[in-house]
Every structure is written in C-alpha cells, then in structure tokens.
Amino acid sequence: MKARLSTKMVGESLEIHCETEFNRIRATAFPKAYFEKDNDTRTGSKGDYIFRDSDEADTEIVSIMFEMKNENDETATKKKNEDFLKELDKDRIEKQCEYAVLVSLLEPDSELYNSGIVDVSHRYKKMYIIRPQFFIPMITLLRNAAQNSLKYKTELAIVKA
C-alpha cells in the first residue's frame, strides 16, 4: 500500500488510522472529550490533533497535542523522531496543551521506540514518543492520571477546609 502513496498521503493515512481508532471508542471511553484536527494556523504552526477532556463540571482535566509522523520506505532523506520534538513543544505551548505526544512510524528498527511509550520529558516538558498501537492506551493513561490527581486535590482541599 505504501508504495502507491505520496509522502503527504502516507502521513495522512496514519492520522486517519489514529482518528478512526479514537472514534471507535469515543462514545464509551471519552464521552465528553474534544478530539479534532488542529486547523488553527494563526501562530504560524500547528500540530495534527488536539485532545481535551473535562470533568462533570466542565473543568478541563487533561489536554494533549498530537503530531503524527510516517514516511515512505523509499524516502531518500530519512527523518528522525528527534527532528520534530522542538516544533511539537512549541505547538503544545501555543495551543495551551499540558502534554505533547509524537505518534511515529519513523525509525522503524529502533529498539527504543519499538519497546513502548518513550518519555522524552528530560528534553521537553511532558512529552512522549509512541508507536500507533499505543495511541489509545496513552490517552487513557494520561486522562486517568489527571482524573486521579484531580480527585486527590479535591480531597486535600476538603481536608484543609
């Protein structure tokens, strides 16, 4: 399939895959979530998707900027995941997202990236690199951690009062 696709189409096929996976479980797993393409280019750049979820009081509990990267096997100049982190961090900050996640099929032979969720927060705050199969688990982990954190903050506020 990849051989017939242009570079732009290969990248878009990864975006469509992730969007389809999310929409399959949206109604049951993320009923209040916002998950849309980032089409706002006023600041000069944009990520691919923004995920935001809120609690029952419509207080935002988590926000994630997603960038999806893929390339043809025949592409002459192979890009590395590292090449996209600075721009992703800039997009995360500009769009006021708490987390940034690079969903990538680049560097297909990398043991590091093939092993699971890679935390690159030592370079860029709250940033991760994942393969597409970890897309839904990553959203779930970050959202659940945020919900638990909110619960503890609420309990602490009650205790202090």
At which residue positions do the language-model features occur?
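Amphipathic, heptad-repeat alpha-helical coiled-coil/stalk segments that mediate oligomerization
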Residues: L5-G11, E15-A161
